[in-house]
Protein backbone atom coordinates (compact mmCIF):
# COMPACT_ATOMS: atom_id res chain seq x y z
CA UNK A 1 0.00 0.00 0.00
CA UNK A 2 1.19 3.54 -0.74
CA UNK A 3 0.99 4.71 2.88
CA UNK A 4 2.86 1.73 4.32
CA UNK A 5 4.94 2.76 7.34
CA UNK A 6 8.24 0.87 7.18
CA UNK A 7 10.12 -0.40 10.19
CA UNK A 8 13.06 1.80 9.13
CA UNK A 9 13.89 4.43 6.53
CA UNK A 10 17.23 6.20 5.95
CA UNK A 11 17.31 9.94 6.61
CA UNK A 12 18.84 11.28 3.39
CA UNK A 13 18.82 14.80 2.01
CA UNK A 14 20.63 17.48 0.05
CA UNK A 15 23.86 17.01 1.99
CA UNK A 16 24.22 13.41 0.86
CA UNK A 17 23.46 14.33 -2.76
CA UNK A 18 26.08 17.07 -2.63
CA UNK A 19 28.60 14.65 -1.14
CA UNK A 20 28.08 12.19 -4.00
CA UNK A 21 28.40 14.99 -6.57
CA UNK A 22 31.68 16.08 -5.02
CA UNK A 23 33.09 12.59 -5.50
CA UNK A 24 31.79 12.41 -9.08
CA UNK A 25 33.33 15.78 -9.90
CA UNK A 26 36.66 14.77 -8.37
CA UNK A 27 37.31 12.04 -10.91
CA UNK A 28 38.26 9.58 -8.14
CA UNK A 29 35.27 7.40 -7.25
CA UNK A 30 36.78 4.30 -5.63
CA UNK A 31 38.62 4.14 -2.30
CA UNK A 32 40.43 7.43 -1.83
CA UNK A 33 40.45 10.72 0.10
CA UNK A 34 36.87 10.42 1.38
CA UNK A 35 37.80 7.12 3.03
CA UNK A 36 40.67 8.86 4.78
CA UNK A 37 38.35 11.65 5.93
CA UNK A 38 35.83 9.11 7.23
CA UNK A 39 38.50 7.19 9.12
CA UNK A 40 39.79 10.39 10.73
CA UNK A 41 36.25 11.44 11.64
CA UNK A 42 35.56 8.11 13.34
CA UNK A 43 38.76 8.39 15.33
CA UNK A 44 37.52 11.77 16.55
CA UNK A 45 34.07 10.36 17.32
CA UNK A 46 35.28 7.34 19.28
CA UNK A 47 38.51 8.71 20.69
CA UNK A 48 40.42 5.73 19.34
CA UNK A 49 43.67 6.00 17.37
CA UNK A 50 43.14 4.06 14.14
CA UNK A 51 40.19 3.38 11.86
CA UNK A 52 39.84 1.21 8.76
CA UNK A 53 36.81 1.67 6.51
CA UNK A 54 35.46 -1.51 4.90
CA UNK A 55 32.66 -2.59 2.58
CA UNK A 56 30.50 -3.91 5.45
CA UNK A 57 30.67 -4.69 9.15
CA UNK A 58 30.66 -8.36 8.14
CA UNK A 59 33.82 -7.74 6.12
CA UNK A 60 35.29 -5.98 9.13
CA UNK A 61 34.52 -8.94 11.36
CA UNK A 62 36.04 -11.35 8.84
CA UNK A 63 39.37 -9.57 8.57
CA UNK A 64 39.50 -8.77 12.30
CA UNK A 65 39.21 -12.47 13.09
CA UNK A 66 41.79 -13.23 10.40
CA UNK A 67 44.17 -10.62 11.81
CA UNK A 68 43.91 -12.37 15.18
CA UNK A 69 44.90 -15.61 13.50
CA UNK A 70 41.59 -17.33 14.26
CA UNK A 71 41.41 -20.72 12.57
CA UNK A 72 41.03 -24.48 12.87
CA UNK A 73 40.68 -25.69 16.45
CA UNK A 74 39.99 -22.24 17.91
CA UNK A 75 36.85 -21.15 19.75
CA UNK A 76 35.22 -17.72 19.68
CA UNK A 77 32.62 -16.73 22.28
CA UNK A 78 29.63 -14.69 21.12
CA UNK A 79 25.97 -14.41 22.09
CA UNK A 80 23.46 -16.30 19.98
CA UNK A 81 21.29 -13.16 20.12
CA UNK A 82 23.09 -11.53 17.20
CA UNK A 83 23.03 -11.36 13.44
CA UNK A 84 24.32 -14.61 11.96
CA UNK A 85 27.16 -12.99 10.01
CA UNK A 86 29.42 -13.13 13.06
CA UNK A 87 28.83 -16.86 13.44
CA UNK A 88 29.29 -17.39 9.71
CA UNK A 89 32.68 -15.67 9.69
CA UNK A 90 33.88 -17.77 12.62
CA UNK A 91 32.79 -20.98 10.90
CA UNK A 92 34.23 -20.00 7.51
CA UNK A 93 37.63 -19.56 9.18
CA UNK A 94 37.44 -23.11 10.49
CA UNK A 95 36.88 -22.09 14.11
CA UNK A 96 34.01 -23.00 16.43
CA UNK A 97 31.46 -20.42 17.57
CA UNK A 98 30.65 -20.83 21.25
CA UNK A 99 27.22 -19.26 21.67
CA UNK A 100 26.23 -18.05 25.12
CA UNK A 101 23.06 -16.79 26.75
CA UNK A 102 22.10 -13.18 27.46
CA UNK A 103 20.40 -11.29 30.24
CA UNK A 104 16.67 -11.97 29.96
CA UNK A 105 15.61 -8.32 30.18
CA UNK A 106 18.39 -6.33 28.48
CA UNK A 107 19.46 -9.01 25.97
CA UNK A 108 23.08 -8.14 26.75
CA UNK A 109 25.70 -10.85 26.97
CA UNK A 110 26.88 -11.13 30.58
CA UNK A 111 30.41 -11.60 31.96
CA UNK A 112 29.17 -14.63 33.90
CA UNK A 113 27.98 -16.40 30.75
CA UNK A 114 31.19 -15.52 28.95
CA UNK A 115 33.47 -16.75 31.74
CA UNK A 116 31.60 -20.05 32.02
CA UNK A 117 32.30 -20.68 28.32
CA UNK A 118 36.05 -19.97 28.36
CA UNK A 119 38.32 -22.92 27.57
CA UNK A 120 42.01 -23.23 26.60
CA UNK A 121 40.82 -23.04 22.97
CA UNK A 122 39.09 -19.64 23.38
CA UNK A 123 40.84 -17.13 21.13
CA UNK A 124 38.39 -14.21 21.08
CA UNK A 125 35.34 -12.76 22.84
CA UNK A 126 32.76 -10.83 20.79
CA UNK A 127 30.27 -8.88 22.94
CA UNK A 128 27.33 -7.26 21.13
CA UNK A 129 26.14 -3.74 21.93
CA UNK A 130 22.51 -4.64 21.40
CA UNK A 131 19.87 -2.30 19.94
CA UNK A 132 21.95 0.80 20.70
CA UNK A 133 22.80 0.12 24.35
CA UNK A 134 26.30 -0.87 25.51
CA UNK A 135 27.42 -4.16 26.98
CA UNK A 136 29.26 -4.08 30.33
CA UNK A 137 32.68 -3.39 28.87
CA UNK A 138 34.67 -2.96 32.08
CA UNK A 139 33.73 -6.44 33.24
CA UNK A 140 34.22 -7.98 29.78
CA UNK A 141 37.62 -6.38 29.21
CA UNK A 142 38.66 -7.47 32.70
CA UNK A 143 37.79 -11.04 31.73
CA UNK A 144 39.79 -10.72 28.54
CA UNK A 145 42.80 -9.40 30.44
CA UNK A 146 42.56 -12.11 33.12
CA UNK A 147 42.52 -14.93 30.59
CA UNK A 148 44.65 -13.29 27.89
CA UNK A 149 41.82 -13.32 25.34
CA UNK A 150 41.28 -10.48 22.82
CA UNK A 151 37.92 -8.68 22.79
CA UNK A 152 36.32 -7.55 19.52
CA UNK A 153 33.25 -5.37 20.10
CA UNK A 154 30.32 -5.84 17.74
CA UNK A 155 29.27 -2.20 17.58
CA UNK A 156 27.01 -2.49 14.53
CA UNK A 157 24.14 -0.97 16.56
CA UNK A 158 26.27 1.50 18.51
CA UNK A 159 27.12 4.61 16.49
CA UNK A 160 26.43 7.28 19.09
CA UNK A 161 26.42 4.89 22.04
CA UNK A 162 28.47 5.74 25.13
CA UNK A 163 29.55 3.61 28.09
CA UNK A 164 30.52 5.38 31.32
CA UNK A 165 31.25 8.64 29.54
CA UNK A 166 33.21 7.24 26.58
CA UNK A 167 31.94 6.50 23.09
CA UNK A 168 31.87 2.83 22.15
CA UNK A 169 35.12 2.04 20.36
CA UNK A 170 37.22 4.29 22.60
CA UNK A 171 39.53 1.39 23.46
CA UNK A 172 40.46 -1.97 22.03
CA UNK A 173 38.81 -2.96 18.75
CA UNK A 174 35.20 -2.30 17.69
CA UNK A 175 33.32 -2.79 14.43
CA UNK A 176 30.57 -0.40 13.29
CA UNK A 177 28.01 -0.80 10.50
CA UNK A 178 26.69 1.65 7.92
CA UNK A 179 23.97 -0.68 6.61
CA UNK A 180 20.77 0.92 5.33
CA UNK A 181 18.85 0.64 8.62
CA UNK A 182 21.67 1.79 10.90
CA UNK A 183 21.85 5.12 12.75
CA UNK A 184 24.05 6.48 9.99
CA UNK A 185 24.17 4.78 6.61
CA UNK A 186 25.81 4.81 3.22
CA UNK A 187 23.67 1.87 1.98
CA UNK A 188 26.44 -0.64 2.71
CA UNK A 189 29.68 -0.15 4.59
CA UNK A 190 31.41 -0.40 7.93
CA UNK A 191 34.46 0.68 9.88
CA UNK A 192 36.83 -0.95 12.35
CA UNK A 193 38.47 1.18 15.05
CA UNK A 194 41.43 -0.05 17.07
CA UNK A 195 44.19 1.16 19.39
CA UNK A 196 46.74 -1.27 17.93
CA UNK A 197 48.78 0.08 14.96
CA UNK A 198 50.02 -3.36 13.89
CA UNK A 199 46.47 -4.69 13.93
CA UNK A 200 45.30 -1.71 11.85
CA UNK A 201 48.04 -2.38 9.30
CA UNK A 202 46.93 -6.02 9.02
CA UNK A 203 43.34 -4.93 8.47
CA UNK A 204 44.34 -2.48 5.73
CA UNK A 205 46.26 -5.20 3.93
CA UNK A 206 43.60 -7.89 4.33
CA UNK A 207 40.81 -5.62 3.09
CA UNK A 208 42.65 -4.93 -0.18
CA UNK A 209 44.03 -8.13 -1.72
CA UNK A 210 46.77 -8.47 0.89
CA UNK A 211 48.63 -5.50 -0.60
CA UNK A 212 50.64 -3.13 1.51
CA UNK A 213 49.01 -0.06 -0.10
CA UNK A 214 45.83 0.64 -2.06
CA UNK A 215 45.34 2.45 -5.37
CA UNK A 216 44.93 5.88 -3.75
CA UNK A 217 48.14 5.41 -1.76
CA UNK A 218 49.97 4.69 -5.01
CA UNK A 219 48.30 7.61 -6.81
CA UNK A 220 48.73 10.25 -4.11
CA UNK A 221 51.91 9.05 -2.46
CA UNK A 222 54.03 8.45 -5.53
CA UNK A 223 54.46 4.80 -4.58
CA UNK A 224 55.63 2.11 -7.00
CA UNK A 225 52.88 1.35 -9.55
CA UNK A 226 52.77 -2.34 -8.60
CA UNK A 227 52.32 -3.03 -4.89
CA UNK A 228 53.58 -6.14 -3.12
CA UNK A 229 51.24 -8.86 -1.87
CA UNK A 230 52.10 -9.43 1.80
CA UNK A 231 49.59 -12.26 2.33
CA UNK A 232 46.39 -13.34 0.55
CA UNK A 233 43.60 -10.85 1.16
CA UNK A 234 40.11 -9.83 0.08
CA UNK A 235 38.33 -7.07 -1.84
CA UNK A 236 36.62 -5.36 1.10
CA UNK A 237 37.46 -1.72 0.39
CA UNK A 238 34.78 1.00 0.56
CA UNK A 239 34.19 3.24 -2.49
CA UNK A 240 34.47 6.97 -1.92
CA UNK A 241 30.81 7.38 -2.95
CA UNK A 242 29.84 5.45 0.18
CA UNK A 243 32.43 7.12 2.37
CA UNK A 244 31.20 10.57 1.33
CA UNK A 245 27.61 9.68 2.20
CA UNK A 246 28.73 8.28 5.56
CA UNK A 247 30.59 11.52 6.28
CA UNK A 248 27.50 13.58 5.51
CA UNK A 249 25.46 11.33 7.78
CA UNK A 250 28.05 11.51 10.55
CA UNK A 251 27.71 15.30 10.63
CA UNK A 252 24.01 14.79 11.42
CA UNK A 253 24.53 12.02 13.99
CA UNK A 254 23.65 14.04 17.09
CA UNK A 255 20.42 15.33 15.56
CA UNK A 256 19.47 11.93 14.13
CA UNK A 257 20.03 10.17 17.44
CA UNK A 258 18.25 12.89 19.40
CA UNK A 259 15.16 12.28 17.28
CA UNK A 260 15.47 8.53 17.83
CA UNK A 261 15.72 9.10 21.58
CA UNK A 262 12.63 11.32 21.55
CA UNK A 263 10.60 8.66 19.73
CA UNK A 264 11.87 5.97 22.11
CA UNK A 265 10.78 8.10 25.08
CA UNK A 266 7.30 8.40 23.56
CA UNK A 267 7.18 4.64 23.07
CA UNK A 268 8.14 4.03 26.69
CA UNK A 269 5.41 6.37 27.89
CA UNK A 270 2.82 4.72 25.63
CA UNK A 271 3.80 1.20 26.71
CA UNK A 272 2.70 1.95 30.28
CA UNK A 273 -0.89 1.44 29.06
CA UNK A 274 -0.16 -1.62 26.92
CA UNK A 275 0.72 -5.24 27.73
CA UNK A 276 3.82 -5.31 25.52
CA UNK A 277 7.15 -5.25 27.40
CA UNK A 278 10.04 -3.07 26.22
CA UNK A 279 13.58 -4.18 26.93
CA UNK A 280 15.06 -3.05 30.22
CA UNK A 281 17.93 -0.57 30.15
CA UNK A 282 21.38 -1.62 31.39
CA UNK A 283 22.07 -0.36 34.93
CA UNK A 284 25.51 1.08 34.16
CA UNK A 285 25.98 4.68 33.03
CA UNK A 286 25.41 4.97 29.30
CA UNK A 287 23.97 6.92 26.39
CA UNK A 288 21.61 4.82 24.28
CA UNK A 289 21.75 5.28 20.49
CA UNK A 290 18.23 3.81 20.06
CA UNK A 291 19.06 1.87 16.95
CA UNK A 292 16.02 -0.29 17.72
CA UNK A 293 12.94 -0.08 19.93
CA UNK A 294 12.06 -3.64 20.87
CA UNK A 295 9.02 -5.01 22.67
CA UNK A 296 8.40 -8.55 23.93
CA UNK A 297 5.04 -10.06 23.00
CA UNK A 298 4.25 -12.81 25.49
CA UNK A 299 1.01 -14.59 24.57
CA UNK A 300 0.12 -15.29 28.21
CA UNK A 301 0.37 -11.58 29.01
CA UNK A 302 -0.75 -10.04 25.70
CA UNK A 303 -3.31 -12.51 24.39
CA UNK A 304 -1.50 -12.72 21.06
CA UNK A 305 1.72 -14.22 19.75
CA UNK A 306 4.56 -12.14 18.36
CA UNK A 307 4.08 -13.50 14.85
CA UNK A 308 0.35 -12.77 14.95
CA UNK A 309 1.04 -9.23 16.19
CA UNK A 310 3.48 -8.60 13.34
CA UNK A 311 0.99 -9.97 10.80
CA UNK A 312 -1.79 -7.81 12.21
CA UNK A 313 0.36 -4.67 12.11
CA UNK A 314 1.23 -5.45 8.49
CA UNK A 315 -2.47 -5.56 7.56
CA UNK A 316 -2.71 -2.08 9.09
CA UNK A 317 0.15 -0.85 6.90
CA UNK A 318 2.83 -0.91 9.61
CA UNK A 319 6.17 -2.66 9.19
CA UNK A 320 8.11 -4.38 11.97
CA UNK A 321 11.39 -6.25 12.37
CA UNK A 322 12.79 -9.26 14.22
CA UNK A 323 16.22 -8.64 15.76
CA UNK A 324 17.04 -11.43 16.02
CA UNK A 325 15.98 -15.00 15.62
CA UNK A 326 18.52 -16.71 17.86
CA UNK A 327 21.45 -17.84 15.73
CA UNK A 328 21.59 -21.30 17.30
CA UNK A 329 18.02 -21.97 16.12
CA UNK A 330 18.93 -21.38 12.46
CA UNK A 331 19.01 -24.62 10.42
CA UNK A 332 22.79 -24.95 10.02
CA UNK A 333 23.59 -24.11 13.64
CA UNK A 334 20.70 -26.15 15.02
CA UNK A 335 22.00 -29.20 13.17
CA UNK A 336 25.61 -28.55 14.17
CA UNK A 337 24.82 -27.85 17.84
CA UNK A 338 21.66 -29.94 18.43
CA UNK A 339 21.96 -30.06 22.24
CA UNK A 340 22.63 -26.34 22.79
CA UNK A 341 19.94 -24.63 24.88
CA UNK A 342 20.04 -20.98 25.89
CA UNK A 343 16.82 -20.37 27.86
CA UNK A 344 16.74 -16.58 28.06
CA UNK A 345 17.85 -16.16 24.45
CA UNK A 346 15.19 -18.60 23.27
CA UNK A 347 12.43 -17.02 25.37
CA UNK A 348 13.17 -13.62 23.85
CA UNK A 349 13.77 -14.89 20.33
CA UNK A 350 10.19 -16.16 20.25
CA UNK A 351 8.74 -12.86 21.54
CA UNK A 352 10.80 -9.87 20.39
CA UNK A 353 9.49 -7.40 17.83
CA UNK A 354 11.13 -4.20 16.59
CA UNK A 355 8.68 -1.33 16.13
CA UNK A 356 9.13 1.45 13.55
CA UNK A 357 11.88 3.82 14.66
CA UNK A 358 13.70 6.23 12.36
CA UNK A 359 14.48 9.96 12.49
CA UNK A 360 11.95 11.01 9.84
CA UNK A 361 9.03 9.39 11.66
CA UNK A 362 6.30 11.96 12.18
CA UNK A 363 3.96 12.34 15.13
CA UNK A 364 1.23 10.99 12.87
CA UNK A 365 3.36 7.92 12.13
CA UNK A 366 3.90 7.34 15.83
CA UNK A 367 0.20 7.76 16.60
CA UNK A 368 -0.62 5.17 13.92
CA UNK A 369 1.61 2.61 15.61
CA UNK A 370 0.21 3.23 19.09
CA UNK A 371 -3.40 3.25 17.88
CA UNK A 372 -2.83 -0.05 16.10
CA UNK A 373 -1.24 -1.60 19.19
CA UNK A 374 -4.23 -0.53 21.31
CA UNK A 375 -6.61 -2.03 18.76
CA UNK A 376 -4.70 -5.31 18.70
CA UNK A 377 -4.58 -5.41 22.48
CA UNK A 378 -8.36 -5.00 22.56
CA UNK A 379 -8.27 -1.62 24.25
UniProtKB/Swiss-Prot annotation:
Its cofactor is pyridoxal 5'-phosphate. GO terms for molecular function: pyridoxal phosphate binding; UDP-4-amino-4-deoxy-L-arabinose aminotransferase. HAMAP family: ArnB_transfer. PANTHER family: TRANSAMINASE, UDP-4-AMINO-4-DEOXY-L-ARABINOSE--OXOGLUTARATE AMINOTRANSFERASE. Catalyzes the conversion of UDP-4-keto-arabinose (UDP-Ara4O) to UDP-4-amino-4-deoxy-L-arabinose (UDP-L-Ara4N). The modified arabinose is attached to lipid A and is required for resistance to polymyxin and cationic antimicrobial peptides. Homodimer. This is UDP-4-amino-4-deoxy-L-arabinose--oxoglutarate aminotransferase. The gene is arnB.
